[in-house]
Each structure stands twice: as C-alpha cells, then as structure tokens.
Amino acid sequence: MLFRSWVSSEARVIDVIRDSLLLFGEALMATGDRFALCGFSSVKRSNVRFHRLKDFDQRFDDRARGRIMAIKPGYYTRLGAAIRHATTILEKQTAARRILLILSDGKPNDLDLYDGRYGIEDTRVAIVEARSHGIVPFCVTIDREGASYLPHLFGPAGFAVIRQPDELPARLPMFYAQLTR
C-alpha cells in the first residue's frame, strides 16, 4: 500500500491515517497475505521522499507499528514518481495478484511544473506503466473533487472517494476484499 502523507490543518486527519494503517496492517497480517506499507511526499522533482514502513519480507511488528506512528503530514504529491517506485518494488513480487492501493488527499501537485495538467498526465502514464507490469492500481482519496479527475487517471472503477476521513479505517479492508476477489 502506498499512502500520501496528508497535508491538513486538522491534525485529526493524520491520526485517522495512522489508525487506518495500523488496523489494515493487522487485518492483512491475519489473512496471511504478503504486503508492504510505504509513504511518500515531495518538494520538487529532486526531493521525492519514499518511506518504506514495512517491506514484504518484514513482519508487521512493533517496529513497523512505530514507523506508522511516526508519520507526520508531508509536503506535496508527486504521485507519478511514487507510483513508479512502488511499481519497481511490486514487480519483484511473485504473487498472483499485485495490488497497489494508494491513499491520497488530492490532485498530483508540487512546487514546480508538476502542478496542473503535467502532474495529472505524468500520474496517468505511471498508472498505465504499472498496469503493463500486471499491477492493479486503486486509489482511495478524501478529496471531494476526486470524482472530477480520478476517472481520467484510474478509470471509472479504479478509485473511491471517501467524504469523511473517519470512514477510512472501516472501508480500507472492504476495498482490499473487492480487489482480491
């Protein structure tokens, strides 16, 4: 799973993200499915931060939980770069179904030219590239305007808009169950 560190004036949103990742990690561990948890944020092209909170070969233990608890709101959303990095990681997995579940708070953007159409198109190309490698990208967003641009990026069935961040902990396992059927 790839999540974008939310930038929000409400500290509560990041708390919901932490809780969601902790509960989702516990649920995935109970299924026996192999999974990784990663995060990202960016400040221009030269500074994309990709954080590996739990790798596929690591246990979901107190160290992984501690890394999740240490998550802080980040900067910008250079989503195409993060998807490409996650694709490289997922390509090495031999699972029958490789799912890239993305949590985001809004449109791809950054301080440079990545804002606007360029960021949208770069992200769309990264999604097409991921699919060409047999990866199934799915985006969950709390951006209420997500329905206006996410179909272009992920297709009509490749995303979900969550209007209330509090719904995230309960809905993540449902999305995962749908994606793994």
Report residues per predicted region.
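Acidic, glycine-rich A-domain
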Residues: 3-181
